[in-house]
Amino acid sequence: HAEGTYTSDVSSYLQDQAAKEFVSWLKTGR
C-alpha cells in the first residue's frame, strides 16, 4: 500500500535524523 510505504519511509527518515542529532549531542558532551 502506497500510504503504508510512505509512512514507513518517513518514520525511518525521522529515526535516522534523530540518531544523527543524538550522536552530535553526545559529541558536544551536553
From Swiss-Prot:
- One Pfam family from the UniProt entry? Hormone_2
Instruction: Name the UniProt key words of this record, in alphabetical order.
Output: Amidation, Secreted
Localization of this protein = Secreted
Listed GO CC annotations: extracellular region
What biological-process GO terms show up in the record? response to starvation
Main location (coarse class): secreted
Q: Which InterPro entries match?
A: Glucagon, Glucagon_GIP_secretin_VIP
Residue positions where Arginine amide is found in the record: 30
One MF annotation (Gene Ontology) recorded for this entry: hormone activity
**Would you identify the family this protein belongs to, as annotated?**
Belongs to the glucagon family.
What's the protein name? Glucagon-like peptide
- Organism, by scientific name, is Anguilla anguilla (European freshwater eel)
* Organism classification: Eukaryota, Metazoa, Chordata, Craniata, Vertebrata
